[in-house]
């Protein structure tokens, strides 16, 4: 921010300390080799339709990485060599900080669209929820956060890929290719309900 150039910071010491105490996964892109997170490229909580986790190490880039930042999105690369989680930042109100003219939360429709266009595109949503001038959340904002969370839970409580008593048939998955033609990575793995299996 303003005046920051007047202070000399030992950023490398910060990075080393955070890395030692917290590991690789909590430093944002300017953490150099220790970075595990990158900014999505906008402050609207929106990720590109095709967002990749990997980025490319680039010694010529300002922060050491080419994150394919274009059109307001950090898109990443399918063939990148460094995994950087694409963090989608957004505000629940019109501003990052609370104010008497910035205390109306977004609608549940807007928040839902934001969720599906961030998390649904492979980027965790970091939703800023500012406290008021008393250090508490305004009731309208707190209610909105609770309702938003409940809407997400309700949206996914019925696994639409499973058969049910009403006659819904279980989903199947097929793919034109599988890694090394190995069925251990077959398309059916996207539907087996296990967190440690996958299709590739």
Where in the sequence are the language-model features?
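Mature catalytic domains of secreted/periplasmic carbohydrate-active enzymes
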Residues: 1-189, 197-198
